[in-house]
C-alpha cells in the first residue's frame, strides 16, 4: 500500500447523520506507527451496536462515521517494532483499538474495562484523528489490538466471533460457568444469542432458549441444538421453569423487564446483561435477595480471551451462522437487522465489493 511514512487514502461506507444511512466516504488513514499493523479488510460483521451508533441512539455519535467492529483482514504492512505479525497474516480487529496501559484493568489484562479505552470507530485516537471502523478497505491498528485468525477458521466465519462469540465466552469463563452439567438460559436469539447457544452447548450445558414468541422454537432446538425453549409470555411455562437455571445470558438490546427472568434462576444464579440499552432497567429487591441472585454485566472480552475463543471454536468445530452480503447491500442489511430479519449475523464481503472504486460524495 505504499510507504509506511505516507498517509493512505481509503474508502469506507459512512453514516453522515442520525438517519444512519451509509454512503461511500473517502478519508486518510494515519501514518503507520512503530507498532502499527496495516490491515486490508476482507470481511466485517454487522452488530446491533452499529445501528445504535449510526443512528445516534446513545447520544454520542460523531459524523461522518464508518461503522464495523468485527473485522477480519490481511496484514499488508507492519511498523518496524511489530513482532507478532507479518505481511500475509490473516488477522482480526474487534471493538477496541486502544487503552491507557496504566490502570488496574489494563495491568490485569482486561483492557476492555479501561476508562480510557479507544473504540474502533466513533472515537478519537491518540493523534487526535477520528477512528473509523471496518466497513472500509483498510485500517491501521496497534498490534496489541490485533489477533491472528487460526487455521481452520474461514475469515467470514471468524468475523462475528470477534464480538458476538467473545461476548458470550468471556462471562462464562470469568464467572466460573464452564463446567459440564450446568443449566443455562439464553434470552434473545440474535447474533449474540445464537453464539450463546452454541458455546454453552459445546461446554456441556443444558441450554434453554427464552424468547417472546414460539416463532423461533424450531430453529433454536433443531438447528442450534438447544435442549428446551421457553416462551416468556406463557405464564404457566415460566412458572414451571422457576428456580431451574444456573445463569441466563441476556442479549436483548431493547428495554425489557428483568423480574420474569430472575424468577427462573436457582439459588446463586446469575443474570448476565449484554444488550446495550439506553433506558433504566428495574426490579424489586426481594427478587435477588430471596435467592442470593446476582444481576451482573459483561462487556466483550480481553485480547487474551479473543485468542482463546477463536481457538475454542476451532477445537469444538463451532461456526457462526451468517449471511454474507456485499457493501452495496449494507443499508438493507442494517434495516433487516433492526427488524430481526437475519439468521443470525450479516457479514460484509468488503474485499469482494471493490469499494475503492465507489464514487464518494463530499464529506
From Swiss-Prot:
Q: Which gene encodes it?
A: CAD2
This chain's function reads: Involved in lignin biosynthesis. Catalyzes the final step specific for the production of lignin monomers. Catalyzes the NADPH-dependent reduction of coniferaldehyde and sinapaldehyde to their respective alcohols. Plays the major role in monolignol biosynthesis. Functions cooperatively with COMT in the culm internodes for the biosynthesis of monolignols, the lignin precursors. May be involved in lignin biosynthesis in leaves and roots.
| Residue sites binding NADP(+) per the record | 49, 167, 188-193, 211-216, 251, 275, 298-300
Enumerate the PANTHER family for this protein.
ALDEHYDE REDUCTASE
According to its UniProt record, this protein's enzyme class is oxidoreductase
Pathway(s) served = Aromatic compound metabolism; phenylpropanoid biosynthesis
A single GO BP: lignin biosynthetic process
Listed A to Z, the keywords are:
Lignin biosynthesis, Metal-binding, NADP, Oxidoreductase, Zinc
Indicate whether NADP appears among the record's keywords: yes
Q: Which PROSITE patterns match?
A: ADH_ZINC
Specify which residues bind Zn(2+) 1 according to the UniProt entry for this protein.
Answer: 47, 69-70, 163
Q: Where does the entry say this protein is expressed, by tissue?
A: Expressed in roots behind the root tips in the pericycle region and layer of cortical cells adjacent to the exodermis. Expressed in vascular bundles and lateral veins of leaf sheaths and blades. Expressed in the vicinity of vascular bundles in the first internode below the inflorescence. Highly expressed in the culm.
Q: Can you say what this protein is called?
A: Cinnamyl alcohol dehydrogenase 2
> Any note on cofactor binding?
Binds 2 Zn(2+) ions per subunit.
EC number(s): the record gives: 1.1.1.195
Amino acid at each position: 500500500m505504499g510507504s509506511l511514512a505516507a498517509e493512505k487514502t481509503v474508502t469506507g461506507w459512512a453514516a453522515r447523520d442520525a438517519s444512519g444511512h451509509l454512503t461511500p466516504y473517502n478519508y486518510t488513514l494515519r501514518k503507520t506507527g512503530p507498532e502499527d499493523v496495516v490491515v486490508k479488510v476482507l470481511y466485517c460483521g454487522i452488530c446491533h451496536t452499529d445501528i445504535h451508533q449510526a443512528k445516534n441512539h446513545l447520544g454520542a455519535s460523531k459524523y461522518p462515521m464508518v461503522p464495523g467492529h468485527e473485522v477480519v483482514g490481511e496484514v499488508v504492512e507492519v511498523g518496524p517494532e511489530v513482532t507478532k505479525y507479518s505481511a500475509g497474516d490473516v488477522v482480526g480487529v474487534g471493538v477496541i483499538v486502544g487503552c491507557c496501559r496504566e490502570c488496574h484493568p489494563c495491568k490485569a489484562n482486561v483492557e476492555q474495562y479501561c476508562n480510557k479505552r479507544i473504540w474502533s470507530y466513533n472515537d478519537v485516537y491518540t493523534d487526535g484523528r477520528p477512528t473509523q471502523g471496518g466497513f472500509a478497505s483498510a485500517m491501521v491498528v496497534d498490534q496489541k489490538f490485533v489477533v491472528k485468525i487460526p487455521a481452520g477458521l474461514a475469515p467470514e466465519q471468524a468475523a462475528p466471533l470477534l464480538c458476538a462469540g467473545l461476548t458470550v465466552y468471556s462471562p462464562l469463563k470469568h464467572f466460573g460457568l464452564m463446567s459440564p452439567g450446568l443449566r443455562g438460559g439464553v434470552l434473545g436469539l440474535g447474533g449474540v444469542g445464537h453464539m450463546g447457544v452454541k458455546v454453552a452447548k459445546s461446554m456441556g450445558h443444558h441450554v434453554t432458549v427464552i424468547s417472546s414468541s414460539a416463532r423461533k422454537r424450531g430453529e433454536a432446538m433443531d438447528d442450534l441444538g438447544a435442549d428446551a425453549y421457553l416462551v416468556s409470555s406463557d405464564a404457566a411455562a415460566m412458572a414451571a421453569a422457576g428456580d431451574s437455571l444456573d445463569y441466563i445470558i441476556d442479549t436483548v438490546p431493547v428495554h425489557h423487564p428483568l423480574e420474569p427472568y430472575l424468577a427462573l434462576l436457582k439459588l446463586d444464579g446469575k443474570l448476565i446483561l449484554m444488550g446495550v440499552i439506553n433506558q433504566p432497567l428495574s426490579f424489586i429487591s426481594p427478587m435477588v435477595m430471596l435467592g442470593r441472585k446476582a444481576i451482573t454485566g459483561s462487556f466483550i472480552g480481553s485480547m487474551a480471551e479473543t485468542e482463546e475463543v477463536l481457538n475454542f471454536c476451532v477445537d469444538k468445530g463451532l461456526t457462526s451462522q451468517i449471511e454474507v452480503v456485499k457493501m452495496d447491500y449494507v443499508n438493507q442489511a442494517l434495516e433487516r437487522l433492526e427488524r430481526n430479519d437475519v439468521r443470525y449475523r450479516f457479514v460484509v464481503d468488503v474485499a469482494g465489493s471493490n469499494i475503492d472504486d465507489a464514487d464518494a460524495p463530499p464529506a
